[in-house]
Structure formats: C-alpha cells, structure tokens
Amino acid sequence: MRSPTQPTLSRAVVESVLADGLGAVEVVDAAELSGGTFATVWRAALADGREVVVKVGPLPSARLLTYEKGVIPAEAEYCRLVRDRAPDVPVPSVLAASDDWIITTLLPGRPLAGQDAPRARLELGAAVAALHEITGPHFGYTGDRPSGRDWPTAFAAVVAALRADAAAWKVPLPPLDGVIERHHDVLAAVSRPALLHFDLWDGNVLVSPSGGLAGLVDGERYLYGDPLLDLVSPALFRRIEDEPEHPFLRGYRPEPFDAAARTRLSLYRLHLYVLMITEGPSRGIRRTDGRHDYLTGLLNAELALLG
C-alpha cells in the first residue's frame, strides 16, 4: 500500500529530476524501489555506466509530522557530513539535491532481514560508534524543528511535538504528562550532542554478498543527542540492554548499562513508540489493523518501567 506521503512518479518525472540534477543524461533503465513509507524512491541506470537513486519527497499538500518538515534536504546534509567526518562509514554520495528531491549513488547490497548477517550487524555497531564521535552544534534536530540548549530540553521538545501531532491527528496515546520531566536528571547526564542516525532498522542497513556491512541509507531523520538513542532501532521492539551478545553491541562496545542508562533507553523506546503510533494516519494505516494496539502495549510496558 502506498503511503499518502509518497508521490506517484512516472519514468518521465524521474528523468526530469535527473536532468535537473545531473544535466543531459541518458536513462537506460529505471524502476521504483519498495520498502519505505515516506518518500518515493527510484533506481536508475545511466548510459555512462552510473547507477543512481532518485528520492522524491512528499507533495506540498501532504500532511506531515512536525519533525518531518525539511527532511529531504536533511538527508543530503547527513550524507555529506558523514562522508566528510567519518569517511570509512558507507553512506551514499550526494550527486544533486533540492528541497524536494535528492540524487545519490546506489550502494551495493540488500537490506538486512531477520536474524541474518551477524557480521554486518557487528560492523554496523562499529560504524555507529564512529558516527557518534561527531559532535553537533546543538541538541535535537536541525532547522526550525524541535531542538534545545541541552539534552533534557531538546528531548522534551521532540516528544512534545509528537504529542501535539497526535492530538492534531486525533491519535490516542496513553497519559504521558510528567514522564520526561521526572527523569530530567538522567537525561542531563548527556553533555555532548553526538550525531545520531536514529532510523537504524533493518531496512536501512545494507549487507554485502559476503555478509559484511555495505551501507547505511535514509539518514534524513538525523539529530544530535545521546548516543544511546541509536541503540533502540537496531533491536526494534526489544530491549538491547538485555541482549549482551547482540552482534550490534559487540561491534559498538558500549559502557556497561547502569540504572541511568537503562532508564534513558526506556525513554528512547517510549519516544520511538509514540512516533510510530502518531505517524499511522499520515501513512494511511488504519487503527483497526492491530498495529496501534501492539505499539500501545509496548509503550505501556515502558511507562510501567519508568514509573
């Protein structure tokens, strides 16, 4: 099912974007790629031998969550930043970009699936650790999206924006008043705004034919903050702190998870579940399909842990 945020593109439109970005190029083959639910993504083979990816963002008429505004340019920012500051981490090269679309090189490999490719997961952990050495200018998102002078302020703003979006979309959430504020002190222990990918679920991690890490894609949701936030999506719907032999952790090599770290991880799962619940209507997902109730159950479990 196509998400309401994904524009329907013809090959002619893709060729027009390529001409705008790359000039006079001949397209010998092009096809839409599946897997995402936000933008529309095509793969194109050019007569000069290059294979590229064309990503086109939502139409201006599409309703988006607050933090999603401007994410197509943000992806270009992320790729350029990583290639400049962490060149050993495989991300696409940006060939051209605008406010509405981005053209990048095509990375080899296939998305992670299930429990396969432990070597790729280990190498992913090491790559993310390298990315976390990059320090940002502030906490939170870039532009006029939620951010703050410190991590407690920024994180509270991020969650508050999602709650406001949920209210606007009439998406029910469990009571959340005061939860973030009660844990101000553990959040305040984060003093450096590290570069975070945030969206490290299996579909955004590419595996080479030999089983190693081939690439990270879809960095448009990046922000700056606590490195622990990036430890949530690699073990989606699970508690990675309870899986010490998880290959991602063996590659990342975090400090031992003390009580404060476990509390922060619980807060970051809360954030992810609030986001996933809230984005349902914008993606055309019916509340009756079971997803809303499943995510609400996970969210309530984290709330019980947080007290």
Where are these regions (language model features)?
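Short, flexible/disordered intra-domain loops and linkers
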Residues: 2-6, 60-70, 285-291
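An alpha-helical support segment within catalytic cores of ATP-dependent transferases
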Residues: 9-25, 108, 117, 130-198, ...
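Short, surface-exposed alpha-helical segments at coil->helix boundaries
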Residues: 11-12, 73-76, 242-246
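ATP-binding pocket architecture of kinase catalytic cores
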Residues: 31-156, 165-167
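Helix-rich C-terminal or lid/interface subdomains of diverse kinases
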Residues: 33, 160-161, 189-191, 221-224, ...
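Active-site acidic catalytic loop and adjacent metal/ATP-binding pocket
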Residues: 34, 39-45, 53-54, 94, ...
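Short strand-connecting beta-turns/loops that link adjacent beta-strands
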Residues: 47-49, 99, 209-212, 270-273
